[in-house]
Amino acid sequence: MRILGIDPGLRVTGFGVIDVSGHRLAYVASGVIRTPTADLATRLGTIFQGVSTLVREHAPDQAAIEQVFVNVNPQSTLLLGQARGAAICGLVSGGLPVAEYTALQLKQAVVGYGRATKSQMQEMVTRLLNLTGQPGSDAADALGMAICHAHSGSTLGTIGAIGGLAPALAKKGLRVRRGRLVG
């Protein structure tokens, strides 16, 4: 199964594509869609077109996107919601089912700790996918979203606590201690 993860943003939208076979995760592609400094409609169109192109190029079976959180600034929340909507339209227009996860669920599934930092997310994504270099934070979050979806269902929320990722971490000489990755 191929999963496309999206980390929505008005200026930068991250994407990550992974293949899942049983418990094995394989990196396919990742990167960002950057919008031009332009009016809102142009930026949303860029996000929609970019996501639509990703769907055509990588032919994912499913997609996962981060839910919007209510920010201190309502205007920022509305803009993020619009960017997210443009990305969802690109996914749905390609015929994909779209799953949604909160940032807390994402971090819990990937790192085993719901309040993990961006650098912890990047490190875990790098290790789980055996990447030679560390992806940028937007691409790492999108790859993490795909990983989260791969581990969703009966295991979501229990991966760190019950050991869904513990064997993978142990093979890499890592473990989670007090919410932090330790070697």
Curated annotation (Swiss-Prot):
**Residues at the catalytic site:** D7, E66, D138
The reaction(s) annotated as catalysed by this protein in its Swiss-Prot or TrEMBL entry are:
Endonucleolytic cleavage at a junction such as a reciprocal single-stranded crossover between two homologous DNA duplexes (Holliday junction)
Q: Which domain of life is it from?
A: Bacteria
Localization per Swiss-Prot or TrEMBL: Cytoplasm
Briefly state the protein's biological role. Answer: The RuvA-RuvB-RuvC complex processes Holliday junction (HJ) DNA during genetic recombination and DNA repair. Endonuclease that resolves HJ intermediates. Cleaves cruciform DNA by making single-stranded nicks across the HJ at symmetrical positions within the homologous arms, yielding a 5'-phosphate and a 3'-hydroxyl group; requires a central core of homology in the junction. The consensus cleavage sequence is 5'-(A/T)TT(C/G)-3'. Cleavage occurs on the 3'-side of the TT dinucleotide at the point of strand exchange.
Q: Which family does it belong to?
A: Belongs to the RuvC family.
The name on file for this protein is Crossover junction endodeoxyribonuclease RuvC
Q: Which organism is it from?
A: Burkholderia ambifaria (strain ATCC BAA-244 / DSM 16087 / CCUG 44356 / LMG 19182 / AMMD) (Burkholderia cepacia (strain AMMD))
